[in-house]
Amino acid sequence: MQVQDGTPGRLTTHVLDTASGRPASNLRIDLYRIEGERPELLSSTRTNDDGRCDAPLLNGSTMETGTYELRFHAGEYLGTAAERGANPFLDVIPIRFGIADRAAHYHVPLLLSPYGYSTYRGS
């Protein structure tokens, strides 16, 4: 799939609640570019009913090489889930990663439970 400036590169994510076996819907995600000492907030979004964002977090001309950080606001999500307690163990989960090829697809899934998480570079 080609986007805005002809490059197919994009950044996407998907959040799954492994405790419930369902997508983590309405989970807030902030995307930062890391340069120097002050992270720059690029965007904030929420996951849809499928645990995905409605649009790529980066694509086309916004897809630059560099270091980025996704901050998943798991505490908000876990605290509002009906079957969870009022004080979740996890709060904001930062995942820092690098983009070396602006024409590549970078997919950063998050598998989330009340007491742990895992991630990997997906496809």
UniProtKB/Swiss-Prot annotation:
Residues binding substrate: 14, 52, 120
InterPro entries on file: Hydroxyisourate_hydrolase, Thyroxine_BS, Transthyretin/HIU_hydrolase, Transthyretin/HIU_hydrolase_d, Transthyretin/HIU_hydrolase_sf, Transthyretin_CS
Catalysed reaction, written as an equation: 5-hydroxyisourate + H2O = 5-hydroxy-2-oxo-4-ureido-2,5-dihydro-1H-imidazole-5-carboxylate + H(+)
GO molecular-function terms, A-Z: hydroxyisourate hydrolase activity
Superkingdom of origin: Bacteria
Keyword DNA damage: no
GO biological process: purine nucleobase metabolic process
PROSITE patterns found in the cross-reference section: TRANSTHYRETIN_1, TRANSTHYRETIN_2
Keyword Hydrolase: yes
Assigned keywords, A-Z: Hydrolase, Plasmid, Purine metabolism
EC number: 3.5.2.17
Note: HIU hydrolysis also occurs spontaneously, but more slowly.
Quaternary structure, from the entry: Homotetramer.
Function: Catalyzes the hydrolysis of 5-hydroxyisourate (HIU) to 2-oxo-4-hydroxy-4-carboxy-5-ureidoimidazoline (OHCU).
Family: Belongs to the transthyretin family. 5-hydroxyisourate hydrolase subfamily.
NCBIfam families named in the record: hdxy_isourate (TIGR02962)
Protein name per its UniProtKB record: 5-hydroxyisourate hydrolase 1
UniProt source species: Rhizobium meliloti (strain 1021) (Ensifer meliloti)
